[in-house]
Amino acid sequence: MSGQTETLSSTSNIPIAKAEPEQSADFSASHKKRGPVSDRSSRRTSSEEVDLMPNVDDEVDGDVKPKKIGRKNSDQEPSSKRKAQNRAAQRAFRKRKEDHLKALETQVVTLKELHSSTTLENDQLRQKVRQLEEELRILKDGSFTFEMSLPHRNPSLSSLPTTGFSSNFAHMKDGISPQSNLHLSPNSIEKPNMHQNVLHNDRSADNLNHRYQVPPTLVDSNSAQGTLSPETPSSSDSPSNLYLNYPKRKSITHLHHDCSALSNGENGEDVADGKQFCQKLSTACGSIACSMLTKTTPHRASVDILSNLHESTVSPPMADESVQRSSEVSKSIPNVELSLNVNQQFVSPFGGTDSFPLPTDTGLDSLFEPDSAIENSHLKNVVMEPELFQAWREPAESLDKEFFNDEGEIDDVFHNYFHNSNENGDLITNSLHGLDFLENANESFPEQMYPFIKHNKDYISNHPDEVPPDGLPQKGKHDTSSQMPSENEIVPAKERAYLSCPKVWSKIINHPRFESFDIDDLCSKLKNKAKCSSSGVLLDERDVEAALNQFN
């Protein structure tokens, strides 16, 4: 048995020769299919193993392939992505082009409309310029005068135009058509309808002028220029108009003459320039009037009309008895400026025995309040005129006129005690008349109120040879350095010549280099040095000369 097993093991270890041809056939086939294959018994290198890895994978799973890393192509996208992008860019460009064309078309339409409107406006302006040139030519041919209206004039008091030009210009303010044959002259100006009542009246023009106290000079100048003076009535024969148009206030006429009489002998242009100069200069005192209040102007505007009616000797004609009674009532009121006696009695103007005292209230407003002492029967036929107290009046002067002088400066209130004082020093210590002042101290100042003055007097009387304290000069027999003037001697202040606005303008136009003056600049310089007073704006003559010398 042992011998058989040995023979079997030996035979198993020996390769069989017949199996070799089959193995060679398989190798040749595998060589054609997968390439050369090394002997299984031989050892393989790492490079050979790497080369053989795909083949091993194919043997394991020949159909499954690993996925690539990165973005995967979608089946929905077109085959050519660049073509799709180009088409989108072309669509956006066409859209922008259409929008731009639409904007340009809109802008062209807007510019056309603007051009047409501008052309129309230019045509209208050219036509307006031609009309103004035609009006200017007509105005140059006519003898129209430009006059400034009165300052602070109430237009409701008079409906008549102040100049012939103003009444004629109302028809030309809308322009003159080239087709209309318009020829203007001073004689062709139509009078207002109010004058027709006077033309139909039986009274003559001279009687009317004498009736309303119009000076002949004003009548001649007004008839030549077609103007109305402040005192000219409104030509209506109604009683109320006759009463209202009566010249109650002389101050308005005075103001008008002050403006028109700036200087004698000048032409109309110089007078007009003088009015403007005075108006600008008067703004330094806060007023635009041509000339300020004068000394002849009533001091209290509230009693202005009443005082003028009281002073007037010729009463206005009354077409009705009731208006005449109202005038008598107005005249019966006293002039408050002249007398304010509380105990004064007034007899009724209607012949009665009733009398009433002046109101005890010191205020001027109490004069215009109704008095219960007057019988109502006296006033049953009186026509009250509300315009009498509602119209504008010029501002009143200061009630403390005695405290101020005409130049607007304060008077020397302490003249009784300090007339010997020196301007540059203290009253007692530095005055040249200090000793005289101390000697008469008891007369001027009571000892109980000013004991120190008494003490100084005793000191000086007891020590005549010593120098007084506080630098007072020594008074003695040997003191001949300064002669003391008498007590009543007063050193007058330096007087300054002040010029009113008309006088200043007269100096300006009489200057040899007047044509080269800058009036606005000169007026602004003079305004800084102007002084306000009750008589108007005043300027120091030296300031005026200094301002005029700058142009030399």
Swiss-Prot record:
Sequence segments annotated as region (Disordered): 1-99, 213-244, 460-489
Biased composition (Low complexity): 229-240
Cellular localization per UniProt: Nucleus; Cytoplasm
Effect ascribed to mutating residue 532 to S: Weakens nuclear export. Impairs nuclear export
Region (n-CRD) residue spans: 259-290
Subunit structure of this chain's protein: Homodimer. The reduced form of pap1 interacts in the nucleus with the nuclear export protein crm1, and in the cytoplasm with the peroxiredoxin tpx1.
PANTHER family named among the record's database cross-references: AP-1-LIKE TRANSCRIPTION FACTOR YAP1-RELATED, TRANSCRIPTION FACTOR KAPC-RELATED
Domain notes: Contains two cysteine rich domains (CRD), referred to as the N- and C-terminal CRD's, n-CRD (Cys-259, Cys-278, Cys-285 and Cys-290) and c-CRD (Cys-501, Cys-523 and Cys-532), respectively. Cys-259 and Cys-290 are not conserved in orthologs in other yeast species. A nuclear export signal is embedded in the c-CRD, with which the nuclear export protein crm1/exportin 1 interacts only in the absence of disulfide bonds (or otherwise oxidized cysteines) within the c-CRD or between the c-CRD and the n-CRD.
Protein name in UniProt: AP-1-like transcription factor
Source species: Schizosaccharomyces pombe (strain 972 / ATCC 24843)
Upper taxonomic lineage: Eukaryota, Fungi, Dikarya, Ascomycota, Taphrinomycotina
